[in-house]
């Protein structure tokens, strides 16, 4: 209901006096990407979502080094550069940002710190809202495990990386400090200047006898089933539900909007179970 009301308010605000140019940006999660279109999101996801645009060319797939701390030039600086270029060249004034995992933290840094970089205010102004898929807003215990260097590190390195700055940042205790001092949108903090809508994956399906296990890659879902054992019962194998809902506002839990289907952390960046259609219709 709140999401619908927000959309109505935006429409009333835009009015009919001028036309807007809508665009969509796909912002990847932890790690360095050079071809996130093919490697992170995959074409089926991107090309399905952008069908919701009046001009399907008005999209950008971000490629940055999110192995760095969120505020660095390689992370938020890189994101600001690519978003600014996109907004400027395509004349975008109604930007929907779709983030996944740690990408939500990088985008939230921009929204929370408009004076940190002279480009941030224009990005914030152009942004309609952020659709934050499985954001690690309160960190993840898996980052704690990797940084502690225990034997579990070998099992999650493929997913999270090995003791990078971004992994250090996503330790639960570190994110608590950032949320209390540097980032907006969590409980007890001022609201973000634009909507930050959480899409929450709440379970992992990995049975070889269940066809749901194969969407996005069976072996990846099996790996997330293993990592889920380290997390709360409500998790996507990487992010606990409490972390995914820690900042901004809840949009939906997977099974409530996808016909009872669950999204693992891998599946929530792919065209699985109609997620792409929900995101498309939001544009």
Predicted feature locations:
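Short aromatic-enriched loop/helix-cap "lid" or pocket-rim segments at secondary-structure transitions
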Residues: 38-39, 140-146, 208-215
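C-terminal catalytic-base region of ester-bond hydrolases, centering on the histidine
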Residues: 189-283
């Amino acid at each position: 209901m709140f999401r619908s009301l927000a959309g109505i308010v935006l429409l009333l605000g835009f009015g009919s006096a001028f036309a807007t140019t809508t665009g969509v940006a796909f912002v990847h999660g932890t790690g360095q990407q050079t071809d996130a279109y093919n490697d992170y999101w995959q074409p089926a996801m991107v090309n399905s979502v952008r069908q919701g645009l009046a001009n399907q060319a008005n999209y950008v797939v971000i490629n940055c080094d999110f192995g760095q701390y969120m505020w660095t030039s390689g992370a938020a600086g890189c994101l600001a550069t690519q978003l600014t270029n996109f907004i400027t060249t395509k004349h975008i004034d109604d930007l929907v940002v779709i983030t996944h995992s740690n990408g939500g933290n990088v985008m939230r840094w921009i929204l929370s710190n408009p004076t940190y970089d002279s480009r941030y205010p224009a990005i914030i102004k152009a942004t309609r809202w952020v659709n934050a898929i499985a954001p690690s807003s309160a960190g993840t215990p898996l980052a704690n495990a990797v940084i502690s260097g225990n034997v579990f590190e070998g099992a999650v390195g493929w997913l999270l990386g090995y003791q990078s700055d971004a992994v250090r940042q996503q330790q639960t205790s570190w994110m608590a400090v950032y949320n209390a001092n540097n980032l907006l949108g969590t409980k007890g903090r001022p609201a973000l200047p634009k909507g930050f809508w959480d899409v929450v994956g709440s379970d992992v399906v990995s049975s070889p006898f269940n066809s749901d296990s194969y969407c996005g890659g069976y072996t990846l879902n099996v790996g997330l089933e293993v990592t889920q054992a380290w997390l709360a019962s409500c998790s996507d194998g990487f992010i606990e539900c409490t972390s995914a809902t820690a900042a901004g506002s809840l949009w939906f839990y997977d099974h409530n909007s996808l016909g009872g289907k669950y999204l693992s952390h891998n599946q929530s960046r792919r065209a699985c179970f109609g997620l792409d259609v929900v995101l498309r219709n939001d544009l």
